[in-house]
């Protein structure tokens, strides 16, 4: 606003508060409404679909306005946050009835996509993480906080590791240092909602100090993060941001955990996406998580999502999970009992977090009591189970008896949603409250008794007690009986046929009854808040309960999925063997029409005899599905789940790499081929002896010979790698790669079989030994409805090309490549030096048979000049 424009006092107050958070939409409490003004009103009206109008604004004449009733905040606030808006809630800080001046207002909360506690903003099956990224000199630090659950985690490492974490945790908001947007988006993309903070926030000493002060410790060694300097900076930035957004009550954030990279299978963002672990690449599609999520509690659903993207790579904890799943199978009564009790738990994790921040409703307090009551039989059942992991869960569950009993004693079983509605605190808890309720809710009975008593004492049968706003409670007596009125009654009003009186008793009762309801609400709120404060000391114990219940829920879900889909327990071991018999794709088999059976397949990989399988076969035959199902079965096993197969022996993998399908990078200007090469390079530069590698149709987007050459070289590199014999499935249309089996002992050819009957192709979807020489692409085109003339012409061209290739002898060169390979030893012609490359090209272009001695000397002199130029 221009300085020379005089605003109304309220609008001046608005713009002063708005200046503190110019990037946020301000919801300004005005009586019974939250209102937005100026640019905020324009944006809010579009997002919320509410009317845009104007408000008088002094000499500025008017300002845009849009608003909604204050009680509809929970409806409209989530819409703004989901639209990626930061929202400043400005409340009235005093009762308008108690002041004649402008009502004092202040910002009571700043809600952002990453800092939300409102149930309508949150998804019960997903965490709502806020992340902070700090760019160090040699590495990067990251921290994640879900204020709705209290989970606080940190890590540091190279950019690709932080990128993986950001994609797996999928934060709703990411903080980083102001001025580093280019660095952030260059490494992590632009898909995140981000917010920049001043550089002073990202300071190691102040961040460490904030963490020590919050956790009330002398150092961070107990959390295992003392050495993570960049992670500490990121974690401190998150605490500072909570302070900036006025989230001061954070007692439920009780620990800071290190994300232990060495505990989990490495899955980069390409693998998570291409395997469709937690989301489908097609709108409305089904992910692995959709298939296996049979969790009952919201905590279980959130934990299962974490397990899917963080499979274990240590066989001991994997087998402990499998033992519990098997126990559920062996003991169906136990499983059903636990299942029944889990239905009573609710979202224990978020409920207790609401207690910490002072946002817990009376009904949620009762739900907390019900959950704690359900934990007792779960604890006893687990303690008596014939399974070590279940007994350990039972040992960690805390009954929290004292707070459970306090809630049962003090809160009614069916309270209202809000404490200010009254009727929350049980009878018998507080004598004053009981008396006030007696006065407020038994008033009619009391007045009737007074009326009967006075009628009998005075002998006036028509006497009645009533109330008006002028002088409160009164006794009305007809004129025919006014001579019977006692002397201590005070006459207040004379009517035509009657007179009205008050008594000292009625005045005292009036004072009690008129203030009783207000006093009840004040006293109930006080008692309720004291109960919530008492909950605080039980937060750590209840959080442990929530984590153990979530774990139990996930394992129960694995058992139910296995039973429903006929999964078996895999053998998970410390070997380099993957031996899957009659394996099935867990997602595809659930999508098949009723009555159609999934065609199961065997896959065997090891580091000694069959390290690499080259799979050929036509389009639509099922090569891609076979690759994915192998990875999914392996991942399910290492999550601790049973798997879709007749038997499965899984030697632990530490990394799974995929080069399957298209990539997001295509949309930002990179060609399909460049994307393939980038992802392939990432795989080849990070191979380990326990890696599982999936390549699907590598080499598209370039010439056939380029594609064959690159595919060949990559397969050869993986086979000949001196340290890492990565188990690999390589699906390809390049049938020339079948020649590799002859010269590379750990490469084996397989094909996905088809039958050709009467010029029609039948896909058998069965993996068989040996390579395939046909892609049947023209048959697929015909099936897709391609015009017959085009199909016929394509067949003619194919016949001509195949004839030409046979005449040129393309099979002979590929065989010679295999026999003439030099393994991992680099020859003169494999060097990357540009001068040597130029010399090589000069020599290769010589026609030695027709070169004269003089021409040879001249050429040698040219080469000498090239060398001197070096």
UniProtKB/Swiss-Prot annotation:
A single GO BP term for this record reads: mismatch repair
**Pfam family membership, one:** MutS_I
Please give the InterPro entries that the UniProt record associates with this protein.
Answer: DNA_mismatch_repair_MutS, DNA_mismatch_repair_MutS-lik_N, DNA_mismatch_repair_MutS/MSH, DNA_mismatch_repair_MutS_C, DNA_mismatch_repair_MutS_clamp, DNA_mismatch_repair_MutS_core, DNA_mismatch_repair_MutS_N, DNA_mismatch_repair_MutS_sf
| Organism placement in taxonomy | Bacteria, Pseudomonadati, Bacteroidota, Bacteroidia, Bacteroidales
- What cystine linkages occur within this chain? none
State its role: This protein is involved in the repair of mismatches in DNA. It is possible that it carries out the mismatch recognition step. This protein has a weak ATPase activity.
Tell me yes or no: is Nucleotide-binding among this UniProt entry's keywords.
yes
Q: In which residues is ATP bound?
A: 617-624
* Keywords, in A-Z order: ATP-binding, DNA damage, DNA repair, DNA-binding, Nucleotide-binding
Q: Does the keyword DNA-binding apply?
A: yes
Gene Ontology terms, MF aspect: ATP binding; ATP-dependent DNA damage sensor activity; damaged DNA binding; mismatched DNA binding
Q: Name one GO cellular component term.
A: cytosol
PROSITE patterns given for it? DNA_MISMATCH_REPAIR_2 (PS00486)
For this protein, the record's PANTHER family field holds: DNA MISMATCH REPAIR PROTEIN MSH1, MITOCHONDRIAL (PTHR11361:SF34), DNA MISMATCH REPAIR PROTEIN MUTS FAMILY MEMBER (PTHR11361)
* Name of this protein: DNA mismatch repair protein MutS
Which family is it part of? Answer: Belongs to the DNA mismatch repair MutS family.
């Amino acid at each position: 606003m221009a300085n020379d424009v005089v605003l109304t006092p309220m609008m001046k107050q608005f713009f002063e508060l708005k200046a503190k958070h110019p990037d946020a939409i301000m919801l300004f409490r005005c009586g019974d409404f939250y209102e937005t003004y100026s640019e905020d009103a324009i944006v809010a009206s579009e997002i919320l679909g509410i009317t845009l109008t104007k408000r008088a604004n002094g000499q500025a004449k008017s300002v845009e306005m849009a608003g909604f009733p204050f009680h509809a905040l929970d409806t409209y606030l989530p819409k703004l946050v989901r639209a990626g808006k930061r929202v400043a809630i400005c409340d009235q800080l005093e009762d308008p009835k108690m002041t004649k001046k402008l009502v004092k207002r202040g910002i009571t909360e700043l809600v952002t996509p990453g800092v939300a506690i409102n149930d309508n903003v949150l998804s019960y099956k997903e965490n709502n993480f806020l992340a902070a990224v700090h760019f160090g000199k040699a590495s990067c630090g990251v921290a994640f906080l879900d204020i709705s659950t209290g989970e606080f985690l940190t890590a540091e490492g190279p950019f690709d590791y932080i990128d993986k974490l950001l994609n797996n945790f999928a934060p709703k908001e990411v903080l980083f240092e102001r001025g580093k947007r280019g660095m952030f988006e260059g490494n992590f993309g632009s898909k995140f909602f981000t917010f920049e903070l001043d550089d002073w926030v990202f300071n190691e000493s102040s961040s460490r100090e904030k963490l020590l002060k919050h956790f009330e410790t002398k150092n961070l060694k107990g959390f295992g993060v003392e050495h993570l300097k960049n992670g500490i900076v990121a974690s401190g930035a998150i605490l500072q941001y909570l302070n900036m957004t006025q989230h001061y009550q954070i007692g439920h954030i009780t620990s800071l955990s290190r994300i232990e990279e060495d505990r989990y299978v490495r899955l980069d963002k390409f693998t998570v996406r291409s395997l469709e672990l937690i989301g489908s690449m097609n709108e409305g599609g089904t992910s692995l998580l959709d298939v296996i999520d049979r969790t009952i509690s919201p905590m279980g659903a959130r934990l299962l999502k974490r397990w899917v993207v963080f499979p274990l790579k240590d066989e001991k904890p994997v087998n402990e999970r499998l033992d519990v799943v098997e126990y559920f199978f062996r003991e169906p009564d136990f499983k059903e009992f636990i299942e029944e009790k889990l239905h009573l738990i609710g979202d224990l994790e978020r409920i207790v977090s609401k207690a910490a921040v002072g946002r817990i409703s009376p009904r949620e307090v009762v739900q907390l009591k019900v959950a704690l009551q359900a934990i007792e039989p779960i604890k006893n059942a687990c303690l008596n189970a014939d399974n070590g992991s279940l007994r350990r869960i039972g040992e960690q569950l805390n009954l929290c008896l004292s707070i459970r009993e306090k809630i049962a004693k003090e809160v009614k079983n069916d309270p209202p949603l809000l404490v200010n509605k009254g009727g929350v605190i049980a009878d018998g808890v507080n004598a004053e409250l009981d008396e006030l309720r007696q006065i407020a809710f038994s008033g009619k009975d009391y007045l009737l008794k007074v009326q009967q008593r006075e009628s009998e004492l005075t002998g006036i049968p028509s006497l009645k007690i009533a109330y008006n706003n002028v002088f409160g409670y009164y006794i009305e007596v007809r004129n025919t009986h006014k001579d019977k009125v006692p002397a201590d009654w005070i006459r207040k009003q004379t009517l035509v046929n009657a007179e009205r009186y008050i008594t000292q008793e009625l005045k005292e009762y009036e004072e009690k009854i008129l203030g009783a309801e207000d006093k009840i609400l004040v006293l109930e709120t006080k008692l309720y808040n004291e109960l919530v404060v008492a909950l605080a000391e039980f937060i750590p114990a209840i959080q442990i309960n929530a984590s153990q219940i979530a774990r139990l829920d996930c394992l129960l879900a694995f058992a139910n999925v296995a039973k429903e889909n006929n999964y078996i327990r895999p053998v998970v071991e410390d070997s380099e063997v993957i031996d899957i018999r009659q394996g099935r794709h867990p997602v595809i088999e659930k999508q098949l029409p009723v009555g159609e059976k999934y065609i199961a397949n065997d896959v065997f990989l090891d580091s000694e005899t069959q390290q690499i399988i080259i799979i050929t076969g036509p389009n639509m035959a099922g090569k891609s599905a076979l690759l994915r199902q192998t990875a999914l079965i392996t991942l399910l096993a290492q999550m601790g789940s049973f798997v879709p197969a007749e038997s499965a022996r899984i030697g632990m993998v530490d990394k799974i790499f995929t080069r399957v399908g298209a990539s997001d990078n295509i949309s930002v200007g990179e060609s399909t081929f460049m994307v393939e090469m980038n992802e392939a390079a990432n795989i080849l530069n990070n191979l380990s002896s326990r890696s599982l590698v999936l390549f699907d149709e590598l080499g598209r987007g370039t010439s056939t010979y380029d594609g064959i050459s690159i595919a060949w070289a990559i397969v050869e590199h993986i086979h000949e790698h001196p340290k890492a014999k990565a188990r690999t499935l390589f699906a390809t249309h390049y049938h020339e790669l079948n020649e590799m089996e002859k010269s590379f002992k750990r490469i084996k050819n397989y094909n996905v079989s088809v039958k050709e009957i009467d010029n029609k192709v039948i896909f058998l979807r069965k993996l068989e030994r040996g390579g395939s020489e046909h892609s049947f692409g023209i048959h697929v085109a015909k099936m897709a409805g391609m015009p017959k003339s085009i199909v016929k012409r394509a067949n003619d061209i194919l016949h001509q090309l195949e004839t030409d290739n046979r005449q040129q002898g393309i099979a002979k060169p590929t065989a010679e490549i295999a026999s003439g390979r030099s393994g991992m030893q680099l020859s003169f012609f494999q060097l990357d030096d540009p001068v040597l490359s130029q010399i090589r090209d000069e020599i290769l272009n010589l026609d030695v048979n027709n070169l004269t001695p003089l021409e040879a000397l001249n050429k040698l002199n040219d080469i000498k000049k090239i060398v001197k130029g070096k």
